[in-house]
């Protein structure tokens, strides 16, 4: 049994997932709860298409600075960041705020 969530990559961040902006996922859950850290591990293992792109998304075990993270349209800083317990039906949006020029 897993947790069904929608993961979105916006602001050009979709390049790390073969240009796919929206992913409907079922995150495996053996027991207990899944936190955002578990979801981040799931994303790096299953959604990011090229391992060389992981540093575009992750730095020091968490989402890189410059990527806005929303949980159900609320800034993840207000939701507990990595400690947020992911629930079925959640929409998790990752938006790059850094753009080339």
Swiss-Prot record:
Pathway: tRNA modification; 5-methoxycarbonylmethyl-2-thiouridine-tRNA biosynthesis. SUPFAM superfamilies: MoaD/ThiS. It comes from the Eukaryota. The modification 1-thioglycine is found at residue 101. C-terminal thiocarboxylation occurs in 2 steps, it is first acyl-adenylated (-COAMP) via the hesA/moeB/thiF part of UBA4, then thiocarboxylated (-COSH) via the rhodanese domain of UBA4. There is a cross-link at residue 101 (Glycyl lysine isopeptide (Gly-Lys) (interchain with K-? in acceptor proteins)). The keyword Cytoplasm applies. GO terms for cellular component: cytosol. It is found in: Cytoplasm. Pfam families: Urm1. Gene3D superfamilies: 3.10.20.30. GO terms for biological process: protein urmylation; tRNA thio-modification; tRNA wobble uridine modification. Keywords: Cytoplasm, Isopeptide bond, tRNA processing, Ubl conjugation pathway. InterPro entries: Beta-grasp_dom_sf (IPR012675), Mopterin_synth/thiamin_S_b (IPR016155), Urm1 (IPR015221). PANTHER family: RURM1 PROTEIN. Belongs to the URM1 family. Acts as a sulfur carrier required for 2-thiolation of mcm(5)S(2)U at tRNA wobble positions of cytosolic tRNA(Lys), tRNA(Glu) and tRNA(Gln). Serves as sulfur donor in tRNA 2-thiolation reaction by being thiocarboxylated (-COSH) at its C-terminus by the MOCS3 homolog UBA4. The sulfur is then transferred to tRNA to form 2-thiolation of mcm(5)S(2)U. Prior mcm(5) tRNA modification by the elongator complex is required for 2-thiolation. Also acts as a ubiquitin-like protein (UBL) that is covalently conjugated via an isopeptide bond to lysine residues of target proteins such as AHP1. This is Ubiquitin-related modifier 1. It comes from Debaryomyces hansenii (strain ATCC 36239 / CBS 767 / BCRC 21394 / JCM 1990 / NBRC 0083 / IGC 2968) (Yeast). The gene is URM1.
């Amino acid at each position: 049994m897993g947790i069904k969530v929608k993961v979105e990559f916006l602001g050009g961040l979709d390049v790390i997932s073969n240009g796919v902006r929206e992913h409907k996922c079922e995150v495996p859950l053996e027991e207990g709860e899944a936190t955002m850290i578990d979801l981040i591990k799931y994303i790096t293992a299953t959604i990011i298409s090229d391992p060389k792109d992981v540093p575009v998304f992750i730095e020091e075990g968490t989402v890189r600075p410059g990527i806005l993270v929303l949980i159900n349209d609320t800034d993840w800083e207000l939701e507990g960041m990595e400690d947020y317990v992911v629930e079925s039906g959640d929409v998790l949006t990752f938006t790059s705020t850094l753009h080339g020029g």
